[in-house]
Amino acid sequence: MDVAQEKPLLSSGQLDVHDLDECRNIRKGSVFIIASGASARDFPLHKYADVPMITMNGAISKFAGTGITPFFYVCTDQGFSQQQPELFTEAMRLCKRVALWERHVWHTTLKPRGELYYLRRAPKLGWRDLLKTDKDLVRCRKLGNGRNRTLGFSRNLKRGFFDARTVAYLALQLAYHVGFTRVFLVGVDLDPLAGRFYEKSGSFVSPCVLDDHFHTRILPSFEILARSVMNEDFRVYNLSNSSRIPVNLVPRVTLEEVDRLI
């Protein structure tokens, strides 16, 4: 795992934006996805410091002061940099790679220390897509309502990603894009009542809409992941005992089991 030493460039100027092809299939093996759920609070980060880690939003706070550099940071909430400016600044300072919306980048004065990649959504499912198989974009094969047309899993982020209304699902697509074959979810509780591990009493709490989308987008997206993406070459495991993701979709493991798998 890399150790953060340099500070970010905080001045304006031309951004060095990298093509997503540059980070496709560049790694293999295990990766941890560190999310913000309360269960991430006790995860022993230093024990697995040599394993690449993808993190998101305020979960970057778990890395502050550790000397551990996240392999990738992703954020799709354009309001996060205004709601939690200190955490967003920390992410831009620490991370080796950052994936953001282009319009998000240009609405902030921060330039990431690491490589910058732009995100974009995968195109909606059309009638012609029903007649062909797309190896990069795994879709819900039902036209139905407009929601079904935007559900899926992207194996190639150059083609766009599918938004499940939880950034952890984007992180899963990123893990596949980069080439990892064993993914361990940390803090993917998806439980608004439990809160985020980094939130403290009396501090500002960013809005949470997980309940609004759990049954309409989040759960159907994980069903696509389990049914059409997970296999011998791409395994996903959940370290959260309080996660709302059903165990029949993503199996749960203990740290002892993780030690045998990585």
Where are the language model's segments positioned?
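Metal-ion/cofactor- or nucleotide/acyl-coenzyme-handling active-site neighborhoods
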Residues: 1-262
